[in-house]
Amino acid sequence: MASPPSSGQPRPPPPPPPPARLLLPLLLSLLLSLAPGAWGWARGAPRPPPSSPPLSIMGLMPLTKEVAKGSIGRGVLPAVELAIEQIRNESLLRPYFLDLRLYDTECDNAKGLKAFYDAIKYGPNHLMVFGGVCPSVTSIIAESLQGWNLVQLSFAATTPVLADKKKYPYFFRTVPSDNAVNPAILKLLKHFRWRRVGTLTQDVQRFSEVRNDLTGVLYGEDIEISDTESFSNDPCTSVKKLKGNDVRIILGQFDQNMAAKVFCCAFEESMFGSKYQWIIPGWYEPAWWEQVHVEANSSRCLRRSLLAAMEGYIGVDFEPLSSKQIKTISGKTPQQYEREYNSKRSGVGPSKFHGYAYDGIWVIAKTLQRAMETLHASSRHQRIQDFNYTDHTLGRIILNAMNETNFFGVTGQVVFRNGERMGTIKFTQFQDSREVKVGEYNAVADTLEIINDTIRFQGSEPPKDKTIILEQLRKISLPLYSILSALTILGMIMASAFLFFNIKNRNQKLIKMSSPYMNNLIILGGMLSYASIFLFGLDGSFVSEKTFETLCTVRTWILTVGYTTAFGAMFAKTWRVHAIFKNVKMKKKIIKDQKLLVIVGGMLLIDLCILICWQAVDPLRRTVERYSMEPDPAGRDISIRPLLEHCENTHMTIWLGIVYAYKGLLMLFGCFLAWETRNVSIPALNDSKYIGMSVYNVGIMCIIGAAVSFLTRDQPNVQFCIVALVIIFCSTITLCLVFVPKLITLRTNPDAATQNRRFQFTQNQKKEDSKTSTSVTSVNQASTSRLEGLQSENHRLRMKITELDKDLEEVTMQLQDTPEKTTYIKQNHYQELNDILSLGNFTESTDGGKAILKNHLDQNPQLQWNTTEPSRTCKDPIEDINSPEHIQRRLSLQLPILHHAYLPSIGGVDASCVSPCVSPTASPRHRHVPPSFRVMVSGL
């Protein structure tokens, strides 16, 4: 029920009401005995002189003990008493005195409205309304003040709704609103350079309004709100979402009961400690965590867990009293006032709003004083005590006087901006189970003051507003690059030495017979492959982005051309060995080095076509691949996001598929040729065996290197190491296989090339006479001109043999037709022929001789007469030309003639020799007859 004013009249009974003056003494004594302290001025305040007219002020606040917020009203009454007493002592309103009439609203809308209307109807004409604690009651009354031309001043209503001046134009408050903390929070965020925050709000209108206003303030200052979460009962889901969005600075708006749940959830999610900062309301009850930890325990959150999660949170609230040692409008410092207040309340619980109530009384007094001055200066001669609820002019004068308020009170500088108090906001921090003031924000001056060495963070520095992502380029290790570069340089020096060796000894038979031009191509390809290693190791840590993009193309071209040059040369040499020795019908075919160069050139042409199309249609570009974040190895509060540079394009898979398909087919065919010629052995003359081994080496290592480098594309050091080692290994092994045997042979036995020119080739397919070795000719492919000369000479000798066969046949027929001369021919003629044509050293029984005999018989079928012919069946051995004696005689004539006819072309008897009977060794032009040439003759 409403508390009757000290000099007013109680609620009248049904008409006719009794005069108020008859009940006044009784009501005063009754109310003072039942509710001591309900009126601050009634307890020890000096009585105004009887002739002083009162200036009535309506006081609306909860006073009863049954209401929780009644303690606020009872707690501020001692401060109100002090203010009224000091105002009267200073005669600030002389000849008037301030008359505050209190009405209990009980924090109930109906009872508050009834008390307001009773004061309007039955009380005196109140100049102003002082009070308003409960938001719902205050908002209802404040909305109707304009109709009564009354200005209301609240000392405890902090709800942001009342800041709407369109709806509440006559409402003021000395206490900052809940929204007043938002500029202070903004200043704190800027001070610690926190540019990214998240909000966690309880689904209550009061908190939602603060959150909405804070959102506008932060957006205006370009501070990112990365996540906005709200909850009704269970905050754990919202807390988990905040963590998932990497929110480090959390701005909370919830009551103290929900605060315990929030911090328990934060403990479960590990959202506390040096990486996180919680900023929550600071108006909770003292030691609020002690009151709610029992409920927290019921949710499986122990007290120590709650305190651990709370450690370091920052509370934001208005400052109850100014901390400055400055005299206020009353002539006393805030500290002196506080001591007087504590001594005066005498058992009444303190209220944190008492300073705002004290300053509020002074605001009312200064407003009325200014209004009286305005009336006195006007020509209307109106008195302030003549105010009534329909006096719009005086109401506007009081409203304007309120807006002009500016003085220093116990709560700081008292200034209104659009009816809102520009007060002081304090910051407290929870440290070691207690709240410590660490700073304050002055809204008038817009300054933030952090008390030295009071604010503490659990880390060495304030938490970061987000996980600091350090984008780190994964680069090639400099020591690794240096080591592999050194190996590459050694390989290039070795290749240069081989090139020098190959060029210097190009006229040596050993080098000539292994195609020195093709060997030069192998060296060139190896050196290009070596050079590509330097380019593959250059990344963003060594070169610029533009240069890296250029290197993408250059290194691809160099490696491709180098591979094709080296492998193509080996492939061509392997193909020539296969073409010569796999098909005996091709033994008369000449495969020159020029043809091999054409093969290599064709391969390079295909490469160039692919590379040019690739570059023109879809060139390689520098791309940066970002990987998932990794913790800092040094333990810092940062996360590392690895970056890796790649050379890619839009259709990378297609182009690589084309290149791999072409190279793969070439490699498979090369391995096939190497396998087919695996049993070809050409000691000291040919390097086909080593070329085949090189083909195997390159094929296997390229497959392994391509696969492993693809799997390790996210590890540049491993990938570069594998690619470089594969290139070094393939190039080095290939060059060593091709040149080291030649180098050793040339150093140890320079004549090895001319000592053994025979080789055996075993066919894979079984023939009727399996395990039979066929002697074939080793053709010096490097000496094309010499080979052509030998072929011409061979043709000439064959024609000469044909003529000799005809002559011999005629002689034989003559012998058969003249038997009477047989004895003479047998005894004299054959002896003469033997003396003339026989050679003393032509009796060696070698395989080459047998081959000559066999081939000669095969190529002269006319010598094999039909022994069954009737005319040739004479029993006389002399008359039978097919008898062994005749055959022996014929061979004794043919072979010496054949031998001497061929000798000049192969370095035998000089054509100018006087007699063929002279030994070939006697000729100054005599040379050792190579076995290969003897075999060649046998195939005529």
Curated annotation (Swiss-Prot):
Residues 1-40 form the signal peptide. Keywords: Cell membrane, Coiled coil, Disulfide bond, G-protein coupled receptor, Glycoprotein, Membrane, Phosphoprotein, Postsynaptic cell membrane, Receptor, Signal, Synapse, Transducer, Transmembrane, Transmembrane helix. The modification Phosphoserine is found at residues 775, 778, 883, 892, 912, 915, 919, 923. The keyword Lipoprotein does not apply. Glycans are attached at residues 89, 297, 388, 403, 452. Residues 781-818 form a coiled coil. It is a multi-pass membrane protein. Its main location: membrane. Residues 762-789 are annotated as: Disordered. Residues 504-521, 572-596, 675-690, 741-940 are cytoplasmic. GO terms for biological process: adenylate cyclase-inhibiting G protein-coupled receptor signaling pathway; gamma-aminobutyric acid signaling pathway; synaptic transmission, GABAergic. Alpha-helical parts of the C-terminal intracellular region mediate heterodimeric interaction with GABBR1. This is Gamma-aminobutyric acid type B receptor subunit 2. It comes from Mus musculus.
